[in-house]
């Protein structure tokens, strides 16, 4: 699947983007490169292969080194909220933006 300059123009219009001719050409090259990679991946025969839930699951000998989940800095909530125009029960209040 290869995109045309018209496809890029339509995508840019749908995304409300205004692309210069150079940006449009670069986008065309990048997207066609991406679709080329996807086509190569689709060409690989994966029949009979069990899907992996996680790539590391294929290698049983790897021991993940996860650190302890601990706070590394003191709680600065009150100090950070002093400059806020409105705070309620420890949360920043913001104006409603969606009707």
UniProtKB/Swiss-Prot annotation:
It catalyses: L-glutamyl-tRNA(Gln) + L-glutamine + ATP + H2O = L-glutaminyl-tRNA(Gln) + L-glutamate + ADP + phosphate + H(+); L-aspartyl-tRNA(Asn) + L-glutamine + ATP + H2O = L-asparaginyl-tRNA(Asn) + L-glutamate + ADP + phosphate + 2 H(+). It is an enzyme of class 6 (ligase). Its EC number is 6.3.5.-. Allows the formation of correctly charged Asn-tRNA(Asn) or Gln-tRNA(Gln) through the transamidation of misacylated Asp-tRNA(Asn) or Glu-tRNA(Gln) in organisms which lack either or both of asparaginyl-tRNA or glutaminyl-tRNA synthetases. The reaction takes place in the presence of glutamine and ATP through an activated phospho-Asp-tRNA(Asn) or phospho-Glu-tRNA(Gln). The gene is gatC. HAMAP family: GatC. It comes from Paracidovorax citrulli (strain AAC00-1) (Acidovorax citrulli). Keywords: ATP-binding, Ligase, Nucleotide-binding, Protein biosynthesis. Coiled coil: none annotated. Pfam families: GatC. GO terms for biological process: glutaminyl-tRNAGln biosynthesis via transamidation; regulation of translational fidelity; translation. Gene3D superfamilies: Glu-tRNAGln amidotransferase C subunit, N-terminal domain. The keyword Transmembrane does not apply. It comes from the Bacteria. GO terms for molecular function: asparaginyl-tRNA synthase (glutamine-hydrolyzing) activity; ATP binding; glutaminyl-tRNA synthase (glutamine-hydrolyzing) activity. Belongs to the GatC family. Heterotrimer of A, B and C subunits. This is Aspartyl/glutamyl-tRNA(Asn/Gln) amidotransferase subunit C.
